[in-house]
């Protein structure tokens, strides 16, 4: 299906100004560029442009996880309270957990996470060690009743999450699964145009003996300081190139990264002293992974038959990426004073076609017909408005058709990232964008 539209036909409600209470750049641009519309405190409707980006992020995540042998499923938003009572976690979330009853007086909740549900599912289906290991994931909307939702999509009450859960026979096997997800996260974030920093962190209410947060660095909009060695970026790039099927190489590299000094501010108990090899930056958390063993399988009696015929508890891990939050983080990193600059991998449209002269309409239509992933500004607005619109919504490339375009057969190509401009023929453009 062709991904192309005209501005005159598209639902693209842009805003010139936003409330003075809007502080983060991602919050401002998600509203101004017509990605979302706020419906209430911490609640947003996703408009066509924003939904396209959200789906493109999902696609990158699915490609990486599927390539690693993980299996997608879908669990419900609404969960039974009795499952959380089984795990002993029902009271841990406090007022952030939205609780209610149905007409039959059954206690329910709007799930903020899915450890209990997935454990209840597999305890009925995975009966033998021969069926392990398994990693299952889903992408679903979650709800946490934040006392003070703020910063737009960065801390909304309703949010889209990718959750994955691993089931293994023992700790050694579980570490292999953990390392596999660890690498897949680095690959995902790199494909999204980000530089991830995996940091040791607190496990919180999820629990577990081993966990890492994945942060991206930013000059604005950070949640707190992170500390990491200056060689971290090179090591992450090297790790992403390792064949995921090479379990030994993946494990060795994971251990190497985890031995480095990478901490969030709250976990930096040892201090960094005067070591100038340690970098300090503002970080935004975009993912969190946990290895928690039998924390849920033991109280919920989720067991399998081991090689010796004895019943054993699953050794489990949990792995999350906040997808809607990730979109906001990408805007924080990839934007300027004119608007968003989407990485090509997730842009809603790769090309913004701008016709500057009425006499060039026929030529512009010909260009539009031969390209894909394009939004064509066919309105009668001024040149300044058209350029500002394309800069704001962040399409990576702008094709500009002037008065002399049809005469000389040349078209101006502008790169949103650095505003570089160059002249191209239509055939050159078709060839260029058929390979991107």
UniProtKB/Swiss-Prot annotation:
It holds the Pfam family HGTP_anticodon. One of its GO terms (molecular function) is proline-tRNA ligase activity. GO terms for biological process: prolyl-tRNA aminoacylation. Its main location: cytoplasm. It comes from the Bacteria. It is found in: Cytoplasm. Its EC number is 6.1.1.15. Catalyzes the attachment of proline to tRNA(Pro) in a two-step reaction: proline is first activated by ATP to form Pro-AMP and then transferred to the acceptor end of tRNA(Pro). HAMAP family: Pro_tRNA_synth_type2. Belongs to the class-II aminoacyl-tRNA synthetase family. ProS type 2 subfamily. This is Proline--tRNA ligase. It comes from Neorickettsia sennetsu (strain ATCC VR-367 / Miyayama) (Ehrlichia sennetsu). The lineage of its organism: Bacteria, Pseudomonadati, Pseudomonadota, Alphaproteobacteria, Rickettsiales. The gene is proS.
